[in-house]
UniProtKB/Swiss-Prot annotation:
This is Small ribosomal subunit protein uS17. Keywords: Ribonucleoprotein, Ribosomal protein, RNA-binding, rRNA-binding. Signal peptide: none annotated. It holds the Pfam family Ribosomal_S17_N. Belongs to the universal ribosomal protein uS17 family. One of its GO terms (cellular component) is cytosolic small ribosomal subunit. GO terms for biological process: translation.
């Protein structure tokens, strides 16, 4: 079913892998040999999550993670970690004494499902979930490639 690269056998916990009977149609979470769900909030489940073969228990579409809380947007600053990216959010902070703004940024680590392909500079939308590790509390819900203009707003380009 999936690429077995770990020492433990990887499988989705809600899927029965034996051959009792064949699966029915492609309803969310039912039938076939793959569990997937719609996370709601206006986000579509990626085709790779439905038809892919990856196993990721921290994926919001195929794993045991629910999205609740904040929905944020930012730019992928680093994609060097395994299934984790750093999202940079730029903002302006007002200095009362000088009546001016200064540029600031915050880095947010976010888990990215293997259903997405992301490069540095891509715009991403992330949603808050339960703590996935010591620092990761967000999950990538949508990737907007850097070259496209849909949904991307012009902001200052960094320091």
């Amino acid at each position: 079913m999936a690429e077995q690269t770990e020492k433990a056998f990887l499988k989705q916990p809600k899927v029965f892998l034996s051959t009792k009977k064949t699966g029915k149609g492609k309803r969310p979470g039912k039938g076939g040999n793959r569990f997937w769900k719609s996370i709601g909030l206006g986000f579509k489940t990626p085709r790779e999550a439905i038809e892919g073969t990856y196993i990721d228990k921290k994926c919001p579409f195929t794993g045991n993670v629910s999205i609740r809380g904040r929905i944020l947007a930012g730019t992928c600053h680093s994609a060097k970690m395994n299934r984790t990216i750093i999202v940079r959010r730029n903002y302006l902070h007002f200095i009362k004494k000088y009546q001016r703004y200064e540029k600031r940024h915050s880095n947010i680590p976010a888990h990215i499902s293997p259903a997405f392909r992301v490069k540095e500079g891509d715009h991403v939308i992330i949603g808050q979930c339960r703590p996935l590790s010591k620092t990761v509390r967000f999950n990538v819900l949508k990737v907007i490639p850097a070259g496209s203009s849909s949904g991307a707003k012009k902001a200052f380009t960094g320091m």
